[in-house]
Amino acid sequence: MEKNFKRTTVTSALPYANGPVHIGHLAGVYVPADIYVRYLRLKKEDVLFIGGSDEHGVPITIRAKKEGITPQDVVDRYHFLIKKSFEEFGISFDVYSRTSSKTHHELASDFFKKLYEKGEFIEKTSEQYYDEEAHQFLADRYITGECPHCHSEGAYGDQCEKCGTSLSPTDLINPKSAISGSKPVMKETKHWYLPLDKHETWLRQWILEEHKEWRPNVYGQCKSWLDMGLQPRAVSRDLDWGIPVPVEGAEGKVLYVWFDAPIGYISNTKELLPDSWETWWKDPETRLVHFIGKDNIVFHCIVFPAMLKAEGSYILPDNVPSNEFLNLEGDKISTSRNWAVWLHEYLEDFPGKQDVLRYVLTANAPETKDNDFTWKDFQARNNNELVAVYGNFVNRAMVLTQKYFEGKVPAAGELTDYDKETLKEFSDVKAEVEKLLNVFKFRDAQKEAMNLARIGNKYLADTEPWKLAKTDMERVGTILNISLQLVANLAIAFEPFLPFSSERLRQMLNMDSFDWAELGRNDLLPAGHQLNKPELLFEKIEDATIEAQVQKLLDTKKANEEANYKAKPIRANIEFDDFMKLDIRVGTVLECQKVPKADKLLQFKIDDGLETRTIVSGIAQHYKPEELVGKQVCFIANLAPRKLKGIVSEGMILSAENNDGSLAVVMPGREVKPGSEVK
């Protein structure tokens, strides 16, 4: 039986303060969390939305070393950028703090000490990689090498970004230190571990029996971890950036970031509510909901609950809605490759269009499987749905009211059967949207809300009030009254999804406030109520705007390919006599034209110093014919003739293939006589 809670604590995964926020973060965590929180607030429920920056861990220290600054400089830069971006985008945190705060350091230290004093940790000595030149133990991200699975270079000690496989530092082939580049050695070090195996029995019961309603991807991943058998997990590591382990003999060691970061939810709450924070974390009448990405499932469903249970006074999460990953134009989003749409850049490039991105990310939400974001789909959903469906209906209803009734809501006369059917339809939508939001199906809930606008467009198209204006103004008034009630319902239904647009629509409708309980009513706007001047809610996004964004990504892709370029391996040696069999000459291009019905082929007439010969070459996608006329090219003169598209080709023009697949014809550095040999 579902329990009724007095309040809800909602957390969203703490973004890592070593870079900006991108659309993958938004789609996976922050947009769905914000939709849910706004929905609860609209229902007048007691809810707290907790956010903050995760500011400890190896990637931050690596970036600091690369830039020659301190880790604090790094986290200061990105914390404030992330916070500002969230505020501008409308992610409505009640508090957004950081794990480098004094409150967090104190609370995380006290949390560790309580578990330590209760005997909840085990101490173990193990061998870990050590950089003898830098005099430092190497955490996973400080070690790089060849991935044992896909054999790409540059894999980290915890993950290969190329193939996505989770790794241990000792898995790497030819490991090297990311600090000095030297080969690390193994050295003994002592650490504290949380024995997750000790918690396995109750975790299995709690997750697999008591939370079968969790999303299949969450439930399935938890079951997989439990079926493999839980192992002790280190809660400390050898680093100089982080929260010092608060026990004797732990000099040079800090709390592992996975242990420290989730405590940030609690410390951020304490920072906001120093006198009442425990109500939100320890009262059984409080519901705890974590919004995360799939890479955080094990930490929020197994590790953090084990920590809370071991401490003894905290509530456990009631639900952990986790999304899969969002890809970008068919490729995995990668911060290291700059393959992302960054939130702060989007806000600059698309001012006032926060809701467009919120809408598209929700429509494509990776709720049960990885999904893809493309700029063409972004444009299509804006133009064909927000503009053509939602915006079009609102504008028609408002403009017609302005035209026929001076912007005042007309009274409704006698209702037809069709009027009553329409009113019932949008009354039914409330129950469906509510049901979907309650089970975290945000994509379907938004789709259902958009159906309100579709109902409205159909109603106006079917009733055609503009045709009745000369003969039956009472009927026109009834049609527009129903249409305006539907517009008001749209403003309420879309508030969790499109808060900026709903606020603008509220002002146009001249409504004081919204209340979810009123959704579905057909008397939200009384007769005679004065509306404000209508404005367009959304505007079309032109092709040129989208092409600029696509080009930005293409430029990024090209830069990545150039940065990662490696020449192909040299082929097996050949004998000198074999090479001497090739007769490579320089010829002058007399004529050049495209080969009909062949996209890749150009036909050349070449002066080879003795005669004119024909050569067909597959470079039509890289050169225009007129670019090559008069140029000198290198070609193999003694290659056996071969027919291509019915044309006899008497040689092969030499080209160099670039890393991006483009071809560059080999030409002499200065003009020489046609027929000159290449030696």
Swiss-Prot record:
ATP binds at T335. Zn(2+) binds at C147, C150, C160, C163. Its cofactor is Zn(2+). It comes from the Bacteria. The keyword Amino-acid biosynthesis does not apply. Keywords: Aminoacyl-tRNA synthetase, ATP-binding, Cytoplasm, Ligase, Metal-binding, Nucleotide-binding, Protein biosynthesis, RNA-binding, tRNA-binding, Zinc. It holds the Pfam family tRNA_bind. It catalyses: tRNA(Met) + L-methionine + ATP = L-methionyl-tRNA(Met) + AMP + diphosphate. Homodimer. GO terms for cellular component: cytosol. It is an enzyme of class 6 (ligase). Its EC number is 6.1.1.10. Binds 1 zinc ion per subunit. The keyword Protein biosynthesis applies. GO terms for biological process: methionyl-tRNA aminoacylation. One of its GO terms (molecular function) is tRNA binding. Residues 578-679 form the tRNA-binding domain. A motif ('KMSKS' region) lies at residues 332-336. It is found in: Cytoplasm. Is required not only for elongation of protein synthesis but also for the initiation of all mRNA translation through initiator tRNA(fMet) aminoacylation. This is Methionine--tRNA ligase. Belongs to the class-I aminoacyl-tRNA synthetase family. MetG type 1 subfamily.
